Amino acid sequence: MSSDSREGPSRFKFRESTRTPLEVPATVLIAGGEIQAKTANVSLGGVFISLPKPPPVGTMVKFALDLNEKAVRGFSEVVWIRPAQESLDRPVGMGLQFRHFLDDGEGALRLFLAEQLQNLEGT
């Protein structure tokens, strides 16, 4: 775990929870428009979503992550972006910090990530 931080209005502490490199389908609702995307990594605290034109830091985003048979839904905030001019060999997109899960989304995400980490350690 790292104590890196990114500057921004919320002074979000980057990488507070273990990130799992994981590409899963994601749907984000930004300014009334639904966008289909993919994650690059997921943690209990947030997610990086690859998106060609990420919205500005501070934007509230409704999200849905398709975790096999369970969709995890909720609300998040854009806490940092990686624009095209800074991407080099990394994906363009946005770092979202989870703000609120719907239903038992947090529990489902916790279980899913534990299974993914176990699979990674077993290989």
Language-model features: locations:
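N-terminal helix initiation/capping motif
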Residues: 1-44, 110-123
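Short, surface-exposed secondary-structure edge patches
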Residues: 17, 50-54
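Hydrophobic core residues within well-ordered beta-strands of beta-rich domains
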Residues: 22, 35, 61, 72-74, ...
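Short conserved beta-strand and strand-loop elements enriched in small hydrophobics
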Residues: 25-28, 58-71
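A residue-level detector for short acidic-glycine micro-motifs
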Residues: 30, 41, 78-82, 100
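Residues located in well-ordered beta-strands
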Residues: 38, 75-77, 97
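Short, solvent-exposed secondary-structure boundary/capping segments
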Residues: 48-51, 83-97
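Mid-chain, well-packed structural core segment of small domains
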Residues: 69-89
